[in-house]
């Protein structure tokens, strides 16, 4: 009986550790997407630095309806962008779309209606990656 309780507590602990809370994301300076965008000024700073050819990196954390985080890491090295996505914390995940350090050549801004859409293009695996939509 004690073993079963110990096992149950261990499982609960491990499940709890796998969650990346919104509070953690805020503390880490992530750009947060859930019913809008929080910390968009960090994205603007990233854009400015990349236009100047300066290295920088960001994390965009998007939360699903269920509250599960999907992480998007973008690093700029002065020439190209490295893109990684991680849906491992999403209970309904499709890890076939996860990427690890995929190289993309450019970050484009497209205006559609009242939104600025930022997309990584010319990526090594042949797929563009939409990063963020901000009000114009």
Indicate residue ranges for each PLM-predicted region.
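Extracytoplasmic electrostatic interaction patches
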Residues: 65-136
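Sec-dependent N-terminal signal peptides of Gram-positive bacterial secreted proteins and lipoproteins
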Residues: 1-21
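Serine/threonine-rich low-complexity intrinsically disordered regions
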Residues: 1, 21, 38-42, 88, ...
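Compositionally biased, low-complexity repeat tracts
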Residues: 12-14, 25, 32, 112, ...
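N-terminal export/targeting and maturation segments
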Residues: 17-80
């Amino acid at each position: 009986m004690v073993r079963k309780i110990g096992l149950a507590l261990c499982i609960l602990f491990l499940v709890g550790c796998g969650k990346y809370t919104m509070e953690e994301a805020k503390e880490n300076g992530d750009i947060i997407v859930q019913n809008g965008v929080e910390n968009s000024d960090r994205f603007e700073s990233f854009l400015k630095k990349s236009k100047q050819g300066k290295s920088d990196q960001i994390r965009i954390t998007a939360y699903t309806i269920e509250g599960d985080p999907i992480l998007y890491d973008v690093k700029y090295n002065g020439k190209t962008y490295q893109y990684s996505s991680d849906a491992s914390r999403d209970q309904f995940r499709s890890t076939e779309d996860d990427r690890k350090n995929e190289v993309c050549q450019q970050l484009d801004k497209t205006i559609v209606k009242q939104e600025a859409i930022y997309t990584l293009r010319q990526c090594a695996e042949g797929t563009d990656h939409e990063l963020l939509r901000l009000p114009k």
